C-alpha cells in the first residue's frame, strides 16, 4: 500500500539553535527526523533535489522551510522536493 503526503517542514529552529558552520548538515538531519516521526518509518531516503535546495546558498544560509512530497512504500519513505 502506497501512502503519499505533502509536508512543509520548518527549518527555523535549526537556524536559531545551530552555529553557522553546522546549519546545512543539521537541516538535513532535521528533515529526515521530521519524516521519520510523521510517516512512522525508520528508513527515509531523501532525493538529491532536497540536498541541493538546502545547500543552494552555502553552509550557513539554509532556507526557512522546505516543501516535500513523501511517499511510503512498505517500510521505506522516499521524499522529493516540491518547487
UniProtKB/Swiss-Prot annotation:
GO terms for molecular function: structural constituent of ribosome. The keyword Ribosomal protein applies. GO terms for cellular component: cytosolic large ribosomal subunit. Disulfide bonds: none annotated. CDD domains: Ribosomal_L31e. Belongs to the eukaryotic ribosomal protein eL31 family. This is Large ribosomal subunit protein eL31. The gene is rpl31e.
Amino acid at each position: 500500500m502506497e501512502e503519499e503526503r505533502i509536508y512543509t517542514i520548518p527549518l527555523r529552529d535549526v537556524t536559531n539553535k545551530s552555529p553557522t558552520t553546522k546549519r546545512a548538515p543539521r537541516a538535513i538531519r532535521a528533515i529526515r527526523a521530521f519524516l521519520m516521526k510523521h510517516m512512522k518509518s525508520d528508513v527515509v531516503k531523501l532525493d538529491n533535489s532536497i540536498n541541493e535546495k538546502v545547500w543552494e546558498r552555502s553552509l550557513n544560509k539554509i532556507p526557512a522551510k522546505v516543501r516535500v512530497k513523501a511517499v511510503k512504500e512498505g517500510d521505506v519513505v522516499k521524499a522529493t522536493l516540491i518547487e
